[in-house]
């Protein structure tokens, strides 16, 4: 599923197509261990866990998952997924760039108060949606519609790993309108969050620190080394996260 750029942990791939940057993914395994390595990308990722036991890490914060739920990965966030027990585990994801929902010709409140703030990082998607939350069912319904438009029959086998994209304009219209519906549900439930002031700096420090460790894993590493590498005392804190 991934191609990584070792020096930055940024994923090198086109999600969807250049004209329609949106894709559907399914990843499954029966074996305990790492399933998706640490990486980041500029797109939003909506993860759906239908069951199984996972550990999702986002910016070095761990989330243990053992029941049906959604998780959102905001643009630029470092994340990975591991499976906690042997057995059948499957996760699905819709990955899309916010640019596909943006319009330079319609600077209405949707653009100025929602789309652009997500693009510039001043607000962000909620981290998680659980079954007991009012927004869960409408988001799940919309998510399943997107999955089916992408060709849901291709993903019926429990442990099939794959990617679906589309060049069909009618399918693209359905997908785009359904993504906007998900945003509307989140907005109606006041689930978009104001980004913490030090959020971007902390993420970049974590990325730089992990990059240093990755590039120097064969050598003995002292805390002062990545701190010096990042030119920031914040790296010291990141190593203890």
Predicted regions and their residues:
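A cytosolic small-molecule/anion-sensing beta-strand core signal
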Residues: 50, 66, 75
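Conserved small/polar residues in nucleotide/adenosyl-binding loops
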Residues: 229-236
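Conserved short histidine dyad/triad with adjacent acidic residue
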Residues: 24-40
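Short hydrophobic/aromatic patch on the recognition helix
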Residues: 68, 237-238
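A hydrophobic/aromatic-rich effector-binding and dimerization subdomain
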Residues: 2-27, 78, 82-159
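Short acidic-glycine-tyrosine-enriched beta hairpin
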Residues: 60-72
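Short, conserved beta-strand element in jelly-roll/cupin
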Residues: 40-55
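Short, Lys/Arg-enriched, Trp-marked, Pro/Gly-tolerant hinge/linker segments that flank
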Residues: 125-137, 150-225
